[in-house]
């Protein structure tokens, strides 16, 4: 993609309304545009990142055995009355009426709808377990939306729901998502720590929030520093191995970690002083086991092996991709701009032509772009008629993992410059060797 033909409305000045780094950089880098309080348009660069985040989430959900579907944003109020949450949910829920005066709502979550879908199709324990997920936009009318997409009113969510015959099966489903979340966040370049958390309006008696540490975090968190060095479950993890998954979850919950709502000062004081960590954190995922809270009142029942009907046990598992984009920036930036992890960068390579209009550099850049794209790399080619300094600033601001810098002097020597955005390291490479070098760098 040539930058001269791309839509990238970069801002030179930091918007006054942006309070935290991610909000400032997303606006400056032309990723988003505010349309109303807590409501944002995702511009092309931002949408590419959002889509790549979703790809990682989807891959790990599929790996865990969850099955994707898509539910509508508009829901019937009657479903929520069945569960008893319609009146209890509060003003965060956007309530509407259609032309026939039927009460509807813009879904803030989907427990009721997924339960209705399940109960209409599943009648026997032989059809269990089931784990279903969808990725859909939601709306919650926050009292004070702030921090850009970190705490917006409209946001993208991945919601998964598990259905099991009994608590033991439901705990295994919970453990699957626990491990899938650890892997998801690691692939996104984040170190997430699972912490005991309140269940809130979702309900239930078991819940973990996945927290990344950040100075701009909304929550106070308390944990053992050892979590920062815990190994991530490998790609070879067998999600059907009940004992192995339980051992992984036991390991990841073996030390103290809690949000402020669940904090126990006496237990935290028992952690060795050098290992104690009190910090601020950003919630990037939340999982719940809530038993029969929804299946009982909504009649989601199956016949067990004894011939008796019983309500299914359920869990709910959420990740907010639009929130995650901001969280990744909070965890990975410097004074010059964003530093994207390879897995979610909008383009793999920024190709900088330092003398646009020069026959040699134009031809070399066109050839390099063709070779890199043929090798499966995405390239944003800065072919604008701008000063080199402006091109360097743009490349650093938008944070592409690699910068290929092409100028007349280097070309005369048969070389181009390659810069790694994360470290600032530079090297010279022959143009025809770039694709192999970048593949090697991505693998390493």
From Swiss-Prot:
SUPFAM superfamilies cross-referenced by the UniProt entry: Class II aaRS ABD-related, Class II aaRS and biotin synthetases
Cellular component terms (Gene Ontology): cytosol
Any one GO molecular function term: proline-tRNA ligase activity
Alphabetical GO biological process terms: prolyl-tRNA aminoacylation
Subcellular location: Cytoplasm
Keyword Metal-binding: no
UniProt cross-references to CDD domains, sorted A to Z: ProRS_anticodon_short (cd00861), ProRS_core_prok (cd00779)
UniProt key word Transcription: no
Pfam families for the chain: HGTP_anticodon, tRNA-synt_2b
Keywords per UniProt: Aminoacyl-tRNA synthetase, ATP-binding, Cytoplasm, Ligase, Nucleotide-binding, Protein biosynthesis
EC numbers, comma separated: 6.1.1.15
Catalysed reactions, as listed in the record: tRNA(Pro) + L-proline + ATP = L-prolyl-tRNA(Pro) + AMP + diphosphate
NCBIfam families, A to Z: PRK12325.1 (NF008979), proS_fam_II (TIGR00409)
Subunit field text: Homodimer.
HAMAP family in the record: Pro_tRNA_synth_type2 (MF_01570)
The family this protein is said to belong to: Belongs to the class-II aminoacyl-tRNA synthetase family. ProS type 2 subfamily.
Function: Catalyzes the attachment of proline to tRNA(Pro) in a two-step reaction: proline is first activated by ATP to form Pro-AMP and then transferred to the acceptor end of tRNA(Pro).
Name used for this protein in its record: Proline--tRNA ligase
Lineage of the organism: Bacteria, Pseudomonadati, Pseudomonadota, Alphaproteobacteria, Hyphomicrobiales
Gene that specifies this protein: proS
């Amino acid at each position: 993609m040539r930058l001269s033909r791309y839509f990238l409305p970069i801002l030179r000045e930091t918007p006054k309304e942006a309070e935290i780094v991610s909000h400032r950089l997303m606006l400056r880098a032309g990723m988003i545009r505010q349309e109303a309080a807590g409501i944002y348009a995702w511009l092309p660069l931002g949408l590419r990142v959002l889509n790549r985040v979703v790809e990682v989430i989807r891959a790990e959900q599929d790996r865990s055995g969850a099955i994707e579907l898509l539910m509508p944003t508009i829901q019937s109020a009657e479903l929520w009355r069945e569960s008893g949450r319609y009146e209890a949910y509060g003003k965060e829920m956007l309530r509407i009426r259609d032309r026939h005066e039927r009460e509807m709502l813009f879904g803030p979550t989907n427990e009721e709808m997924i339960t209705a879908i399940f109960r209409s199709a599943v009648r026997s324990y032989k059809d269990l377990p089931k784990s279903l997920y969808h990725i859909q936009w939601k709306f919650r009318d926050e009292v004070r939306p702030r921090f850009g997409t970190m705490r917006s009113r409209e946001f993208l969510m991945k919601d998964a729901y598990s259905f099991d015959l009994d608590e033991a099966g439901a705990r295994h489903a919970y453990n699957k998502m626990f491990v899938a979340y650890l892997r998801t966040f690691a692939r996104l370049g984040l170190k997430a720590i699972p912490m005991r958390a309140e269940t809130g309006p979702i309900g239930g008696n078991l819940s973990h929030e996945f927290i990344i540490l950040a100075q701009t975090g909304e929550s106070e968190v308390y944990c053992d520093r050892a979590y920062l060095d815990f190994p991530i479950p490998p790609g070879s993890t067998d999600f059907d191995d009940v004992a192995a998954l339980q051992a992984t979850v036991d390991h990841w919950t073996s030390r103290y970690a809690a949000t402020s709502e669940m904090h126990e000062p006496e237990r935290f004081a028992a952690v060795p002083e050098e290992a104690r960590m009190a910090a601020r954190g950003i919630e990037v995922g939340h999982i719940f086991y809530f038993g029969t809270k929804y299946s009982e009142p909504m009649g989601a029942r199956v016949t067990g092996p004894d011939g008796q009907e019983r309500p299914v046990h359920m869990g709910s598992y959420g990740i907010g991709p639009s929130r995650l984009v901001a969280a990744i920036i909070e965890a990975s930036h410097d004074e010059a701009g964003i530093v994207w992890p390879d897995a979610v960068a909008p383009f793999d390579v920024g190709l900088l032509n330092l003398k646009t209009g020069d026959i040699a550099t134009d031809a070399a850049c066109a050839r390099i772009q063709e070779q890199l794209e043929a090798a499966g790399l995405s390239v944003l080619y800065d072919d604008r008629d701008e000063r080199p300094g402006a091109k360097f600033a743009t490349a650093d601001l938008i944070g592409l993992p690699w910068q290929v810098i092409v100028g007349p002097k280097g070309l005369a020597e048969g070389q181009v410059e390659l810069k790694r955005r994360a470290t600032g390291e530079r090297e010279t490479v022959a143009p025809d060797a770039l694709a192999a070098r970048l593949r090697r760098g991505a693998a390493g």
